[in-house]
């Protein structure tokens, strides 16, 4: 590694953000104490942590660095005529009321049901301008890596760690290794960030990023919008990575400017100057590197029961017989057995029962627009739920007429929430049903007991909606 002109060693963005937040250095016997800039909380993983604070007589260490919303267990149907929300069960209603009480008692800013800013936590946080370059961000949710799209070091934590951050604003963490994923070329028509990340996970495998933070680099990544970068980083955990990020640039700054929690005036100029120093230095080294050519990719879809089991929509369902490793062969056999798919058969044409467009992976305005491109002037042939990721997304989409396109196509236009991504809120599959979903996990039963999930982009999901089967969105858009 060559030194920079000032004599210092070149550093990656991960090094820079990590080093700036170490309160106590890591030793062989103890992890580092890492300061946390932003703590996002929701109604499912926070109640126990607040209970611990009460039991121990502790206050919230930094209320101004804690931000709350509701998303997992809330209904995506509107209030009834009686003014009540149609919760799926008493537990869901209790989680919401407990969240309201906890935030009131501890002075946490909450954007709950009925609030114009409420949304899925990883859509809501960036929209508020709370997520900013160079930050450390945590949340009691697996897909916190979404916020890495802004050049933040963002990762999910468990409920006990939620309590640690509430009480101390710090966490015990071991320094992660770094993995550079460089994507050359340009994505072709009909492809998006979702296709790119599914291709990356298929290449790495679901454990390929274990112990690492992924930095996404290259012209194909730079060409992505902020919505696309959030999709990319969101699924880093599905490759086993601790987090994923993209260095900030003008695209980042333009997206953040003017948002509620973003700096204003001279403070904004000072912040941007700091943020411009965050990208990895020339000559910085990574523990590992992976390279892909975006131009070689096709629209992707999963066929199995983990996000690494993905193929092009033009491809064939893999045959376990071709798998040399016995363990991998057994895993593939089990996945195909659960999914009810035939090896060697084209995935295109596979009948679909439900389509879900939404989630923290693909519930943003760009995703709504992409789905509307396919739905416009067509009719769905299967049940289709379109769920905006936040009230802001919903409002913007309705201003553009996207809700009318969705309804005229025969699809359902819902209220913001996690919805069918996690199936704990009344939106779920029945046993044996196939769903093309824009969410992030296709585990057994993820969308309901016995449900079969095929992960795809909004374009591919919408193509499945109007054809009733897995289809190449490029052909649908071309009218073929």
UniProtKB/Swiss-Prot annotation:
Pfam families in UniProt: Aconitase
The molecular function terms in GO held by this entry are:
3-isopropylmalate dehydratase activity; 4 iron, 4 sulfur cluster binding; metal ion binding
Which pathway is this protein engaged in? Amino-acid biosynthesis; L-leucine biosynthesis; L-leucine from 3-methyl-2-oxobutanoate: step 2/4
Identify the EC number(s).
4.2.1.33
Q: Which InterPro entries match?
A: 3-IsopropMal_deHydase_lsu, Acnase/IPM_dHydase_lsu_aba_1/3, Acoase/IPM_deHydtase_lsu_aba, Aconitase_4Fe-4S_BS, Aconitase_4Fe-4S_dom, IPM_dehydratase_rel_enz, IPMI_cat
Per the record, the domain of life is Bacteria
Cofactor annotation comment: Binds 1 [4Fe-4S] cluster per subunit.
Enzymatic reactions = (2R,3S)-3-isopropylmalate = (2S)-2-isopropylmalate
Q: Which cofactor does it need?
A: [4Fe-4S] cluster
Matching SUPFAM superfamilies, A to Z?
Answer: Aconitase iron-sulfur domain (SSF53732)
Which keywords, in A-to-Z order, does the entry hold? 4Fe-4S, Amino-acid biosynthesis, Branched-chain amino acid biosynthesis, Iron, Iron-sulfur, Leucine biosynthesis, Lyase, Metal-binding
Q: One of this protein's GO BP terms? A: L-leucine biosynthetic process
Question: Per UniProt, where does [4Fe-4S] cluster bind?
Answer: 360, 418, 421
The answer to whether keyword 4Fe-4S applies is yes
Role noted for this protein:
Catalyzes the isomerization between 2-isopropylmalate and 3-isopropylmalate, via the formation of 2-isopropylmaleate.
User: Member of which family?
Assistant: Belongs to the aconitase/IPM isomerase family. LeuC type 1 subfamily.
Give the record's subunit note.
Answer: Heterodimer of LeuC and LeuD.
Q: What is this protein called?
A: 3-isopropylmalate dehydratase large subunit
In its UniProt entry, the species of origin is given as Anaeromyxobacter dehalogenans (strain 2CP-1 / ATCC BAA-258)
Q: What gene is behind this protein?
A: leuC
């Amino acid at each position: 590694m060559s030194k920079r002109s000032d004599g210092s060693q070149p550093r990656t963005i991960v090094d820079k953000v990590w080093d700036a937040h170490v309160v106590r250095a890591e030793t062989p016997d103890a992890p580092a104490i890492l300061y946390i800039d932003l703590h996002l909380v929701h109604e499912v993983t926070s109640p126990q942590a607040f209970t611990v604070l009460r039991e121990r007589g502790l206050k919230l260490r930094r209320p101004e660095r804690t931000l709350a919303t509701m998303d997992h267990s809330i209904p995506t149907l509107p209030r009834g005529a009686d003014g009540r929300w149609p919760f799926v069960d008493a537990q869901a209603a209790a989680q919401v009321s407990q969240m309201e009480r906890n935030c009131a008692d501890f002075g946490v800013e909450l954007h709950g049901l009925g609030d114009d800013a409420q949304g899925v936590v990883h859509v809501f946080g960036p929209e508020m301008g709370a997520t900013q370059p160079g930050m450390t961000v945590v949340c009691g949710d697996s897909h916190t890596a979404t916020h890495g799209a802004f050049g933040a070091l963002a990762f999910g934590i468990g409920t006990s760690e939620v309590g640690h951050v509430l009480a101390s604003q710090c966490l015990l963490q071991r320094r992660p290794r770094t993995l550079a994923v460089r994507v050359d070329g340009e994505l072709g028509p009909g492809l998006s960030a979702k296709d790119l990340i599914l291709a990356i996970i298929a290449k790495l495998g679901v454990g390929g990023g274990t112990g690492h933070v992924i930095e996404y680099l290259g012209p194909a990544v730079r060409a992505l919008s902020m919505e696309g970068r959030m999709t990319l980083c969101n699924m880093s955990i599905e490759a086993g990575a601790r987090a994923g990020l993209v260095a900030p640039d003008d695209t980042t700054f333009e997206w953040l400017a003017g948002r509620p929690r973003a700096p204003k005036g001279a403070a904004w100029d000072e912040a941007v100057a700091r943020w411009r120093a965050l990208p990895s230095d020339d000559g910085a080294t990574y523990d590992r590197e992976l390279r892909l050519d975006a131009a070689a990719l096709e629209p992707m879809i999963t066929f199995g029961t983990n996000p690494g089991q993905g193929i092009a929509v033009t491809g064939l369902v893999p045959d376990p017989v071709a798998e040399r490793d016995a363990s991998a062969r057994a895993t593939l056999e089990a996945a195909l057995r659960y999914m009810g798919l035939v090896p060697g058969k084209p995935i295109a044409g596979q009948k679909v029962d439900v389509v879900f467009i939404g989630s923290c992976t693909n519930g943003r305005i760009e995703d709504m627009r992409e789905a509307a491109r396919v739905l416009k002037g067509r009719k769905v042939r299967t049940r289709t739920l379109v769920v905006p990721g936040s009230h802001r997304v919903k409002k913007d989409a309705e201003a553009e007429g996207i809700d009318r396109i969705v309804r005229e196509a025969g699809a359902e236009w819902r209220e913001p929430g996690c919805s069918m991504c996690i199936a704990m809120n009344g939106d779920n599959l029945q046993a044996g049903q196939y769903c093309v979903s824009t969410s992030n996990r296709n585990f057994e039963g993820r969308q309901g007991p016995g449900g079969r999930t095929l992960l795809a982009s909004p374009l591919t999901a919408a193509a499945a909606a109007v054809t009733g089967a897995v289809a190449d969105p490029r052909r649908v858009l071309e009218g073929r």
